[in-house]
Amino acid sequence: MAARREPSSDDESYEVLDLTEYARRHHWWNRLFGRNSGPLTEKYSVATQIVMGGVSGWCAGFLFQKVGKLAATAVGGGFLLLQIASHGGYIQIDWKRVEKDVNKAKRKIKKEANKSVPEINTLIEESTDFIKKNIVVSGGFVGGFLLGLAS
């Protein structure tokens, strides 16, 4: 049997853990996703970051172009059909009511825009901070996005 130890004295010293240093070395995403995850600037070379940003930007730009063309065609075609129907006498548009509704919508938008200014400012600040921290990836994304729009 193992020998019992007597309780130690009150003068026993304890090791103090510095949690700030621990937090710097062990990011929260390391616990979630593993040791190999982390910010792009810590993981990949500059060339890899540019390529990753460029490829994802090109994909986003290409999809934006295709969806934009489809949406523009749908909206333009709808207006064209409305004009043809109006010209043919199938429908009649009450332009005074349209003007009244447009003015009402303008007033509502102005009223709502004044309320949401602080939220927009914080969104802009967060976006600016993100772009500054990830300037290489952001630059690659913008370049790829423009190339995707052009292709």
From Swiss-Prot:
A biological process term (GO) from this entry: response to hypoxia
Membrane spanning residue stretches: 44-64, 71-91, 130-150
Record has Lyase as a keyword: no
Motif (YXXL): 14-17
Family annotation (InterPro entries): FUN14 (IPR007014)
Keywords from the UniProt entry: Autophagy, Membrane, Mitochondrion, Mitochondrion outer membrane, Transmembrane, Transmembrane helix
Annotated coiled-coil segments of the chain: none
Source organism superkingdom: Eukaryota
Subcellular location: Mitochondrion outer membrane
Membrane-topology descriptor: Multi-pass membrane protein
One GO CC term, this protein: mitochondrial outer membrane
PANTHER family: FUN14 DOMAIN CONTAINING (PTHR21346), FUN14 DOMAIN-CONTAINING PROTEIN 1 (PTHR21346:SF2)
Family per record: Belongs to the FUN14 family.
Job of this protein: Acts as an activator of hypoxia-induced mitophagy, an important mechanism for mitochondrial quality control.
Entry protein name: FUN14 domain-containing protein 1
Organism of derivation: Xenopus tropicalis (Western clawed frog)
